[in-house]
Amino acid sequence: MKRVLLLLLCALPAAAGPLEEAGLIDVQTVENLPVFVSLRYATQNNFTGKKIYSSAKCYLHKDAVEGLKKAVSLAAQENEPFTFCLWDCYRPQDEHRKLWQAKPDPSYVAMPKRGSRHSRGMAVDLTPCDFNGNPLKMPTDFDSFTKEAHMDFYDLPADVLARRETLKKIMTTAGFTYTRTEWWHFDKKGWKSKPLLNVPIP
């Protein structure tokens, strides 16, 4: 009897964690979503020079995931098809405060008292890449904090400018809005209705 009970317990699905209860999903567990995850803040390869995240998993709210699915589908239909490499996804509030301490400039990092849209699971930082995960040429690297990263900067090589505009078109069609100072940052519409979270990334 004990053995049967143990087998039944093992067959039950794992209990949802606090992120899942808030509607967030581990992007790499989503079927038919061929994206690459390379969280910069899970490494030292970011503007702080320090590892900010203890986990390299990309969590997004299910609404943002649906938008990302649409963006991936649209990118695959381009004359030169591509997919995306995700640089940042859900960001706990504690980790966001660390970024603010390193760059206390609201033009680039949201003020902690207002909270980041990343902390709602409704923002994603990404770049176009080929289907082997190699990033395509874009105006700047991630978190460059320069005028060249601005969406209204046009003194760029023709192919780079065209790719940035294609990215903007795809993401806005998929239900995201863009940020003027960061070509890589997109917010899913409806983010205001989602709570700020400070749950560690598992």
Q: How would you label these PLM feature ranges?
A:
Residues K2-R3, R91:
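Basic side chains
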Residues A16-W87, Q101-P202:
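Extracytoplasmic cell-surface/polysaccharide-interacting catalytic and binding patches
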Residues L86-R97:
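Secreted/periplasmic proteins that engage bacterial cell-wall peptidoglycan
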Residues P13-A14, Q93:
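Residues at or immediately preceding the N-termini of alpha-helices
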Residues R3-P13:
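Sec-dependent N-terminal signal peptides
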